[in-house]
């Protein structure tokens, strides 16, 4: 999967490592005026995906999040719409 400025790859991170990384990424993305970003968490057991999505649903900069389209990782990634 191609890495771009609008995505963060959490492969290999624990939940405790991933959440602060996602928070920094969201703030940087918001400052860069991005409105749609992707969080790549992998398919695996779903532990990281669940923790990240739970965090995203409560984050003040997140308007909406959902499973990414197949070309952006499908169930292994989450598409995030940032607030205006």
Identify what each model region corresponds to:
Residues 1-84:
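Long, charged, low-complexity intrinsically disordered regions
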């Amino acid at each position: 999967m191609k890495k771009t400025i609008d995505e963060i790859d959490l492969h290999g991170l624990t939940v405790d490592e991933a959440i602060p990384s996602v928070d920094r990424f969201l703030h940087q993305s918001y400052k860069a005026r991005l409105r749609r970003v992707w969080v790549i968490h992998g398919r695996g057991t779903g532990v990281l995906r669940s923790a990240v999505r739970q965090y995203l649903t409560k984050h003040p900069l997140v308007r909406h999040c959902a499973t990414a389209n197949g070309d952006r990782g499908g169930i292994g990634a989450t598409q995030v719409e940032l607030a205006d």
